[in-house]
Design a protein with these regions (language model features):
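Mid-domain Rossmann-like dinucleotide-binding core that forms the NAD(H)/NADP(H) cofactor-binding site
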Residues: 1-73
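Non-catalytic, hydrophobic alpha-helical segments
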Residues: 7, 151, 173-176, 191
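Short conserved AdoMet
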Residues: 17, 43, 103, 130, ...
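Glycine-rich phosphate-binding loop and adjacent beta-alpha segment
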Residues: 61, 93-160, 193-202
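Short acidic active-site motifs
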Residues: 74-78, 93-97, 147, 172-175
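A short acidic, Gly/Pro-enriched loop at the edge of an enzyme's catalytic core
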Residues: 78-86
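N-terminal Rossmann-like NAD(P) cofactor-binding module of classical short-chain dehydrogenase/reductase
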Residues: 86-87, 109
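C-terminal capping/lid region of NAD(P)-dependent oxidoreductase domains
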Residues: 157-166, 175-204
Length: 204
């Protein structure tokens, strides 16, 4: 449940409002998809835009709680839009560009490091952080039981679909890695033993 735990912690830190326009950078990531599902379940009228590096997954994203997509070309969004809230999953590599797209009074929550860069370089907070905008973070290394309980209650109350994208058996671990790392990779997968996988497939 760590993926949804991280997504819920980020959602709470962003203080979502029903009228918000939200950007999720790295929309096809597991946390990105979980966040979009959680947000739409409680706030069905929010407008969620996901950033992707190509438009090939647009159809899939629009069936996973996203309203629109924007192309992220080499760490820069190909849009002039501004957003009330931004979930930053790429990390320090794109934070400066995210601040170029935050609306007055907006919040950026830095949760991921998918860009492979761990630290901010040449970052002047007075210049980079817009007036009346905010940056926060969420880190799931220290699990809080109260938040974990809140997660399961949230999923039950809002009937959130938490099913994984794909299910693999133990023997299919190489295929699972290939799927996640390939161009068709999308969201999270689950590895289970063969007997349980057969029961899972029967339910579908």
């Amino acid at each position: 449940p760590e993926t949804y735990y991280t997504a819920l912690g980020s959602l709470k830190n962003l203080h979502i409002k029903p009228e918000d326009k939200i950007l999720v950078r790295a929309a096809t990531s597991g946390v990105g998809l979980a966040f979009a599902r959680l947000a739409k379940a409680q706030f069905p009228d929010v407008h969620i835009v996901g950033s992707v590096r190509s438009g090939s997954k647009q159809f899939l994203l629009k069936h996973q709680a996203y309203d629109d997509i924007v192309i992220d070309q080499d760490g820069r969004l190909e849009t002039e839009e501004q957003f009330d809230k931004i979930l930053e999953l790429v990390g320090p590599l794109t934070i400066k560009d995210s601040f170029d797209h935050i609306a007055p009074g907006g919040i950026i929550c830095v949760t991921g490091l998918l860009g492979g860069q761990w630290e901010l370089e040449s970052f002047n907070p007075i210049e980079e952080i817009k007036n009346n905008s905010f940056m926060t973070t969420f880190h799931s290394a220290q699990v809080n039981q109260e938040l974990m309980d809140e997660l399961f209650d949230y999923i039950d109350r809002y009937q959130v679909d938490v099913s994984p994208r794909r299910v693999f058996s133990l023997e299919e671990v190489p295929e699972a890695h290939a799927y996640i790392e390939g161009k068709t990779g999308f969201g999270k997968v689950v590895i289970i033993n063969e007997n349980k996988k057969e029961k899972y497939d029967e339910k579908d």
